[in-house]
From Swiss-Prot:
Pfam families assigned to the protein according to its UniProt record, in alphabetical order: DeoC
Functional description taken from the UniProt entry: Catalyzes a reversible aldol reaction between acetaldehyde and D-glyceraldehyde 3-phosphate to generate 2-deoxy-D-ribose 5-phosphate.
Pathway in which this enzyme or protein is active: Carbohydrate degradation; 2-deoxy-D-ribose 1-phosphate degradation; D-glyceraldehyde 3-phosphate and acetaldehyde from 2-deoxy-alpha-D-ribose 1-phosphate: step 2/2
UniProt subcellular location: Cytoplasm
Protein name: Deoxyribose-phosphate aldolase
Reactions accelerated catalytically: 2-deoxy-D-ribose 5-phosphate = D-glyceraldehyde 3-phosphate + acetaldehyde
Keyword Cytoplasm (UniProt): yes
Species in which this protein is naturally found: Mycobacterium leprae (strain TN)
Gene3D superfamilies to which the protein is assigned, alphabetical: Aldolase class I
């Protein structure tokens, strides 16, 4: 997207997110109410909160959740079972974290098989693959980030996603989104998440190629549109 979107256009690209471990059912209900008010695309909550989000949204709101979060170092079958349970609870999209250590070690076969196990477990459900782009760019290089995106595509992902937002290396960046967009060439969506707190941040990432935004400060970002 080039140029400044309208408030409605930007909201329609947002996964309104609450992944803090201390979040309560009341917090999730408030998140859902705000999501409906703001007109966002979906909410994204922790796996244990999927039923609460579905109930609060009366089944009329898309609910995304996370798998292997936030480290990505869960055994693949555990990620797959977590995804299956989330979908059974009403999740419509799954954001899984890759085996980041395997990616840094150059073991792309392990990265691919990990994604494929989750993909096969939830066929037909939107799957976003979190690559922790700040880690890959900081500890490896641009080629590694591109290769991981190619692996995600080959494994059947629908999106590549920059970050969990919980790693000290950082969240989304224009550089990462640009590289990821180039790597998938419009064949997959690109979700930017982590540290997006202003309208300026959001617009820059959309201009770089992001097609979805993960925001916890959604109202503040939308209110920042001039």
């Amino acid at each position: 997207m080039q140029g400044q979107p309208t408030r409605k256009q930007l909201a329609a690209l947002v996964d309104h997110t609450l992944l803090k471990s201390e979040a309560t059912h009341a917090d999730v209900a408030a998140l859902v109410a705000e999501a409906v008010e703001l007109g966002v695309y979906a909410v994204c909550v922790s796996p244990s909160m999927v039923p609460a989000a579905v109930e609060a949204g009366a089944g009329g709101l898309r609910v995304a959740t996370v798998v292997g979060f936030p480290s990505g170092e869960h055994v693949s079958i555990v990620k797959a079972q977590e995804a299956v349970q989330a979908v059974a609870s009403g999740a419509t999209e799954i954001d899984m974290v890759i085996a980041v250590g395997a990616a840094l070690a150059g073991d792309l076969d392990a990265v691919r098989s990990d994604i494929e196990m989750v993909r096969s477990a939830i066929a037909g459900v939107v799957l976003k693959v979190i690559v922790e782009s700040a880690v890959l760019l900081g500890q490896a290089n641009e080629r590694t980030l591109a290769e991981v995106c190619h692996v995600a595509e080959a494994a059947g992902a629908d999106f590549v996603k920059t970050s969990t937002g919980f790693h000290p290396a950082g969240g989304a960046s224009v550089r990462a989104v640009t590289l990821m967009t180039e790597a998938v060439g419009g064949r997959l969506g690109v979700k930017a998440s982590g540290g997006i707190r202003t309208a300026v941040d959001a617009i820059a990432l959309l201009d770089a190629g992001a097609t979805r935004l993960g925001l916890s400060s959604t109202r503040e970002v939308l209110d920042g549109l001039s």
